[in-house]
Amino acid sequence: MAKLKSAYVCNDCGTEHGQWQGQCASCGEWNTLSKINLGPANAPSAAANFKRQGITGSLSSVTTLNDINLEDQPRIATGIGEFDRVLGEGIVPGSAVLIGGNPGAGKSTLLLQILCKLSQDIKALYVTGEESLQQVAMRAKRLDLPTNKLLMLAETNINEITNLAQEHQPKLIVIDSIQVMHSAEIASAPGSVSQVRECAAYLVQYAKQTNTAIFFVGHVTKDGNLAGPKVLEH
């Protein structure tokens, strides 16, 4: 049986340490390290495995700013003025955006409204990991949203999500929420520091390599901070 690789991860900044220590060497906080199992010692990370699966595109090519054709990257306007302004006048293809807020603040409803509208012209996928498809459909009906073209998926396995995304090739994806997603490559529970970090990295790489815009819904703690490692915010 393969030996499990373990590490101590700071709950505040997400920095890995080879052994436990009272103070995080990166952010300086005390008593924030938690032990996690990362899977077999020779197992690749989810992000590394993603690139091995043959997703088109590369993140390692070198170019100059003058060689980048901005005409091929038009922003996608949502029609919601304040939201577009926050994003710099629209959604950028290939971007990964984290939407955080208190429970009931309207994160899921806002993104559902945006995807229903944009799905009339652009292929869009809404992935729900917390609510059932019926619950999402009821909310859309209550808001009288156009749902005839929006793709829906109830799934929390990040590998299955990206496999289906490759099959249907949506240009917009909502992940609701990142805290309930998990990767089969990581031997820890959904919502743990390692799971959130790896799933986010996996999806960001997918967004960059396929030019797909992805929105993550993120929960917040009682203190008003985003739940999970600090690296999720960056």
Describe the residue ranges of each PLM region.
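Catalytic, metal-anchored helix/loop core of enzyme active sites in primary metabolism
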Residues: 44, 161, 195-199, 205-215
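Short metal-coordination and nucleic-acid-contact micro-motifs, chiefly zinc-binding Cys/His arrays
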Residues: 4-6, 20-23
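Short Cys/His-rich micro-motifs in 6-15 aa windows
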Residues: 28-38
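Flexible beta-alpha connector loops of hexameric P-loop NTPases
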Residues: 72-73, 148-155, 183-197, 224
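The Walker A/P-loop phosphate-binding site
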Residues: 51-143, 162
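Phosphate-binding/switch region of NTP-binding enzymes
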Residues: 204-234
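Nucleotide-state-sensitive switch-loop elements of NTP-binding domains
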Residues: 116-186
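Short cysteine-rich clusters marking metal-coordination/redox-active sites
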Residues: 10-13, 24-27
